[in-house]
Amino acid sequence: VRSGIALVRIATRLAATIPTLLFPIAHAHFGDGPHPVAPAEILTWNDEQRSVGFRSYADIFPTRTIRAGEITSPLVENHQDLSGVSYSWEGKTFTLDDYLQANRVAGIIVVQGGRIRFERYRLDSGPSTVWVSYSIAKSVVSMLFGAAIADGYIEGVKDPITRYLPRLAGGAYEGVSVEQLLQMSSGVTWQEDYVDPQADVSRLPSRILPLIDYMQALPRAAKPGTKFNYSTGETHLAGAVLRAAIGNNLADYLTHKIWQPFGMEADGNWMLGTRGGAEHAGCCISATLRDYARLGLFAMGGGVAADGSRILPPDWMAASTSPSPNFPGYGYFWWLREGGAFAAVGIYGQLIWVDPNNEIVIAMQSAWPSAGSRALAGQRWAVVDAIATAVNAEN
C-alpha cells in the first residue's frame, strides 16, 4: 500500500512538468529486491531528472526519517547582496550569478556568526525543499562516531573494527582500526569510478550482510594506515561498525544526537539499502539547505547542542579535521581546505564548507551536469573563496 501511494504521489507531481521522469520513477520498487531505479542509475539521469529526482529521494527509494524536534535553532537574517561577487577561472572573470546558472545550483546559503548573509534558490527549490546530499553523509557519520565515543559505545579510534563487527575477522579488514577506516587508509583496494559499471562502487550489494562480505573479500593493496584510497564502500562498512556498536539504526541515532539537540528546522531522511534495512552510510541524507548550514554550524562549534550541552568529545572535531598521516587533504571523512577550513562534499555539487576562523558556513545544493570533475570542483572552490573574501570584507 505504501509503495502504491508513493508512486501515485510522485507520478502526479511530475506528470505535468517532466514527462521524461515518469518512466524511471514510476517503476520504482519499494520491496526487498533490487530497485528498477537502482542507485547507480542516477548517473544516467538528464538535467531535468536530476533537478526533480534529487528532491524526491523519499519517493523513489526506501528511506528512514530523521525527525526534527519542537525547538528550532534560529538563524538571524542579515542579508548582503553577493550576487555580483566576482571570481576568476581559467583566465576569465565570472560573477556568483554566473556560477549559479551555469552549474545548476538549486540553493546556496552563506552564514556568518549565526547570521544568514546570503540565500538564493533556483530550479524550483525553496527553503522547505529537502535535497539529497550524497557523500555529505560521510561527514555526518564521522560526527556520529564521535557521539558514540562520548556515549561509551566505542572506546576509541584505535580500536580494531573487528571488536564491533566480528564478521570481518580473517578478511581484508583484519587489523584495521576505527581511525584508519575514518581516514580511508585501510589499505584495501576499491574502485570509486562513477562511469564504470564494473567498478566496486557500482557493484556493491545493497543488503548489509552481502555488503560486508563483499568488502572483506576485496584484496589488500597496502598496509593499514599507509595509503589513502577514497571508498564509499568503506563508509558503508563504517556505518555497519557504528550500528553494531550503538545497537540502533543511524537515522534514529542522528535524530537524537544532532538533529533534535541542535534544533534542525525540518525532518530529513536517509536512504536505505532495502526497505526497513540499513542506511547507506556513505550516501544520501536529504535535508533542507538551512539544515545543511546548521550541520556546518554544529561542526564548527565542536559538537555542542543548542542548550550548551556537549554531544561530541571536546577534541573530536579538531581530530576529525586534522590531516591524515599519508594524505593531508583528508581527515575523518572530512575534506580539508586552506586556512583551517574543512568541507563535506557530495557528487553533483553538494557542499557544506566550514571556516571556523572567520565563522563562515557555506552550503550548496546542486544538480551539476556530471557527478564531478576537476574543472567543476576547481570552479566551485574559486567561487567559495570569493564569497568568503566578500563576506569578511563587509563584516
Where on the chain are the PLM-derived regions?
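Catalytic-site signature segments of enzymes, centered on catalytic residues
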Residues: 121, 127-128, 195-276
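Active-site helix/loop module of the DD-peptidase/beta-lactamase fold
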Residues: 132, 151-189, 217, 246-282, ...
